[in-house]
Amino acid sequence: MKFIDEAKIEVAAGKGGNGATSFRREKFVPRGGPDGGDGGKGGSVWAEADENTNTLVEYRFVKRYQAKNGEKGHGSDRYGAGADDIVLKMPVGTLIRDLDTGETVADLTYHGQRVCLAKGGKGGLGNIHFKSSVNRAPKQSTPGEEGEARSLQLELKVLADVGLLGMPNAGKSTLITAVSAARPKIANYPFTTLHPNLGVVRIDENHSFVMADIPGLIEGAAEGAGLGHRFLKHLSRTGLLLHVVDLAPFDETVNPAEEALAIINELRKYDEELYGKPRWLVLNKLDMLDEEEAQTRTAAFLEAVGWDYPKPDDRFQFDMETPRLFQISALTHQGTQELVHQINQYLTEKKRIEAEKAEAEKAAANVEIIEQQPKTDTGVFKPE
């Protein structure tokens, strides 16, 4: 299936049914009172996050979604039937914006999340509601309300804990295959990966994380060159980036350091926030080099890119600040277990810190609410 991560659609809820104007007609009751029922509600349009839906391709072909109108009211105080709602299944990670206002309508972040995109109109009132002591035979009823209508922009940003970044053919797809059950297409030529691939990396029964592999970047990606620029947005929700570098390119004229610096430059030009995300360096394809050559190339590469970070100190607590360096072979799995182990440690510590921060903010908000409450004089003796 073709990977589609953007679409524009129109949604329109149904109109409420009109209320009925009707009077009782029974034998021996020549002047029966009003008995017009209310109209039914119009159908609404909902978006629902579905973990089994992976692309927005359906919304490229069907552009408009119109819910049905509610049924009009009937005599004998019978209400009109409400129209069925429409539920649009969308991938988890879909961001929905109103094209006219720019407002974010919904951010679908978990399976089963449901958001109303267009609310159906209320049914009109039948004339039974307008009976009074001065008007025993009202002919008044109200029409149903119009349903909401919107033009929407759908944008899919995959949800992953870790994102792989690098030039085409750096070995990102091989890495995600080595550490997860994902099976992306792998071949010895650039741009084998044409859309994001997700892989779940399982550490044990209780710990796992999601890794995203996007098409490789090339110089000029921020301006639209190559394929990767379309998918950089998918890295915006990740908590950690792995910059994968081919340390043993087949083309001897290729300079890994220059390519790595070009990637960093493209990242900065595309989005400062994305550039500022925690980023670890992964030197790949060590299986192509003997030990001495690997050490020589690694030292030359680190000097060329200005890597002068100390080795992280994890003796007392996992070091969250210092960028990390890994030397691996995704093909032979050399070094990959240590890599995923440290990623898991990082993500676990990150979640703990975020939970503590959220708890502290909640406590501070509660204190502020208490301080803002008006003080009363209850229980204070005030002699007259």
From Swiss-Prot:
Pfam family, one: GTP1_OBG
Domain Obg, first and last residues per copy: 1-159
Chain positions recorded as GTP binding sites: 166-173, 191-195, 213-216, 284-287, 329-331
PROSITE patterns xref list: G_OBG (PS51710), GTP1_OBG (PS00905), OBG (PS51883)
Subcellular locations according to the entry: Cytoplasm
Keywords: Cytoplasm, GTP-binding, Hydrolase, Magnesium, Metal-binding, Nucleotide-binding
Enzyme Commission code: 3.6.5.-
Ranges where the OBG-type G domain occurs: 160-348
Gly residues compositional bias, start-end: 33-43
GO process terms (BP): ribosome biogenesis
Task of the protein: An essential GTPase which binds GTP, GDP and possibly (p)ppGpp with moderate affinity, with high nucleotide exchange rates and a fairly low GTP hydrolysis rate. Plays a role in control of the cell cycle, stress response, ribosome biogenesis and in those bacteria that undergo differentiation, in morphogenesis control.
NCBIfam families: Obg_CgtA, PRK12297.1, PRK12299.1
Subunit description: Monomer.
Matches recorded under HAMAP family: GTPase_Obg
Name this protein carries in UniProt: GTPase Obg
Organism: Neisseria meningitidis serogroup B (strain ATCC BAA-335 / MC58)
Gene: obg
